[in-house]
C-alpha cells in the first residue's frame, strides 16, 4: 500500500507529477510528435470531465443497451497496440441491466485503403458494411416520414416536432458522411468500460439509437 501523504506532501507530489508531464509533452512536440501530444492532452481533459461527472452519474438515465447494439465510446489514450480513442463498438452483454454502470464491448475499426481482408489477424473479423447500411436505411425511413408531413396544415406542436426530427436527420447524415463502408471487429480487445464513456447514443435522439448487428 502506498504511503499516506500529508497535505503538503500531496501538493508537492502533484507539482512534481505535473512538471514531469509538462516535460514529456514538450519533448513530444519538439520531437515532431505533436499529434501524440495533442491526443494525450485531449484525453486528459476528457478524463477530467468523466471524473467530474462520476459522482452524479446515473446509468438509469441512459438507454438500455442490448446485445448487438452499436455504440460509440471513448476508449482513452492507451499504450502499445491497445485500441484507443473514439470508436464504434458492439455491446456483447447478454442482458445488461439499466442500472449497471458498465458494459462489455468489442471495439471496431474501419477498413483502410491498405487493408488486405484476406490477411486479417486471428483476432480480427470483417463484419462488412452492415453498420453503414443500417444507418443509411434509418435515415431513409426518417426522411420518408418527414416528406409525408403536410406542413401547411401542421399545428405548432407538429411543426416543432418536425424541426426536431429534421435536425436529427441532419446529424445522422453527418455521421454517415464520416463513416467508412467496412468494419473490422477486434475480438482480441474485448473490454469492459463505464457507460460514462458513451459518446452516442445516450438518449432517444442518439444517432446510433436502435442500431444492432445481426446475430450471425
Please report, for each region that a protein language model flagged, where it lies by residue.
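C-terminal terminal-subdomain/extension
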Residues: 1-50, 54-55, 63-66, 117-216
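Short, surface-exposed secondary-structure edge patches
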Residues: 60-64, 80, 94
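Short, charged beta-turn/beta-strand-edge "cap" motif at the junction between a beta-strand
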Residues: 74-82, 96
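Short solvent-exposed strand/turn elements
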Residues: 103-119
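Residues located in well-ordered beta-strands
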Residues: 88-90, 104, 186
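Short beta-strand-centered aromatic/proline hotspots
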Residues: 84-95
Amino acid at each position: 500500500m502506498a504511503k499516506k501523504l500529508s497535505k503538503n506532501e500531496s501538493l508537492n507530489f502533484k507539482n512534481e507529477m505535473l512538471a514531469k508531464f509538462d516535460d514529456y509533452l514538450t519533448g513530444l512536440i519538439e520531437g515532431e510528435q505533436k499529434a501524440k501530444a495533442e491526443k494525450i492532452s485531449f484525453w486528459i481533459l476528457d478524463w477530467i470531465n468523466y471524473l467530474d461527472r462520476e459522482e452524479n452519474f446515473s446509468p438509469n438515465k441512459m438507454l438500455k443497451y442490448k446485445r448487438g447494439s452499436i455504440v460509440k465510446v471513448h476508449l482513452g489514450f492507451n499504450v502499445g497496440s491497445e485500441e484507443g480513442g473514439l470508436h464504434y463498438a458492439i455491446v456483447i452483454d447478454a442482458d445488461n441491466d439499466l442500472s449497471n454502470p458498465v458494459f462489455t464491448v468489442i471495439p471496431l475499426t474501419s477498413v483502410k485503403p491498405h487493408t488486405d481482408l484476406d490477411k486479417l489477424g486471428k483476432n480480427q473479423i470483417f463484419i462488412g458494411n452492415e453498420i453503414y447500411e443500417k444507418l443509411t436505411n434509418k435515415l431513409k425511413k426518417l426522411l420518408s416520414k418527414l416528406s409525408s408531413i403536410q406542413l401547411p396544415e401542421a399545428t405548432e406542436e407538429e411543426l416543432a416536432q418536425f424541426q426536431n426530427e429534421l435536425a436529427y436527420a441532419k446529424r445522422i447524415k453527418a455521421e454517415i458522411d464520416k463513416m467508412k463502408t467496412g468494419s473490422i471487429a477486434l475480438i482480441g480487445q474485448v473490454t469492459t468500460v463505464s457507460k460514462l464513456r458513451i459518446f452516442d447514443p445516450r438518449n432517444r435522439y442518439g444517432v446510433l439509437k436502435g442500431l444492432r448487428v445481426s446475430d450471425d
